[in-house]
């Protein structure tokens, strides 16, 4: 389950490791928020995101 509350509030904070604003990831260490690169439907569980995107190898 995705802990991100973006769909409800537009913002989320995932255990301190991930912060979203307006449903876009601003800082992220885990794939708890939609910070995948364009064309990537979701990042693999436990994927480390760098900046606003994760590595394409994390795509699933």
Swiss-Prot record:
List the protein's name: Metallothionein
**Gene encoding the protein:** mt
Pfam families the UniProt entry points to = Metallothio
N-acetylmethionine is carried by which residues?
1
Binding-site residues for a divalent metal cation 6, renumbered to this chain: 36, 40, 43, 59
Region entry Alpha: which residue ranges? Answer: 29-60
Presence of the UniProt keyword Metal-binding in the record: yes
Top-rank taxon: Eukaryota
**Membrane spanning segments where?**
none
